């Protein structure tokens, strides 16, 4: 079941028209940042920054939704992943929450096709190997509880991160 819904690709998340929503690895102030966040803000245009300013912010492990503006997607779901320090400050739990809350919000809005970046594994320094496992197991758990909720849960990754996710996904499907 999962193989038909959870997919991984290497590419640019701002250029995925086949999904209704993309997820932004946001900062808590919902301002334009670097990496994926910066690319999403640039591609969406200045109206996104205005809507985010009106929302006011988002706590770590939570999610909010905006319009997609100039992106080929109807919505952007903004979620804040944890900054990684020692791994002993509930980072794994908070990262799982960021993914879960994004899926929950998308499901509540009737979104059937969603694309994620790898949350917190860039400038927030979450180990990619552990982050991939958390991302994929959280999606699997969500689908187990809500089997008909999504047609596609896509991870759009850079080449290096894609290789790690692909290996983790392969191992998870063997269990």
From Swiss-Prot:
Gene3D superfamilies: Leucine Aminopeptidase, subunit E, domain 1. This is Uncharacterized protein FN1951. Belongs to the MacroD-type family. The lineage of its organism: Bacteria, Fusobacteriati, Fusobacteriota, Fusobacteriia, Fusobacteriales. Coiled coil: none annotated. InterPro entries: Macro_dom, Macro_dom-like. It holds the Pfam family Macro. CDD domains: Macro_OAADPr_deacetylase. Residues 1-173 form the Macro domain.
């Amino acid at each position: 079941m999962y193989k038909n819904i959870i997919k991984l690709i290497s590419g640019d998340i701002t250029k995925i028209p086949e999904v209704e929503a993309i997820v932004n690895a946001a900062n808590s102030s919902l301002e334009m940042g670097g990496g994926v966040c910066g690319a999403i803000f640039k591609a969406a245009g200045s109206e996104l920054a205005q809507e985010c300013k009106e929302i006011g912010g988002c706590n770590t492990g939570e999610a909010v939704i905006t319009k997609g503006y100039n992106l080929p997607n109807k919505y952007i779901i903004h979620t804040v992943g944890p900054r990684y320090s020692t791994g002993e400050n509930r980072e794994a739990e908070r990262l799982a929450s960021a993914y879960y809350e994004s899926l929950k919000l998308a499901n509540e809005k009737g979104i059937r096709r969603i694309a994620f970046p790898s949350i917190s594994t860039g400038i927030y320094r979450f180990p990619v190997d552990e982050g991939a496992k958390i991302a994929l197991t959280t999606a699997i758990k969500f689908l187990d509880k809500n089997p008909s909720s999504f047609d596609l849960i896509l991870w759009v990754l850079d080449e290096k991160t894609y290789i790690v996710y692909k290996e983790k996904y392969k191992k998870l499907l063997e269990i």
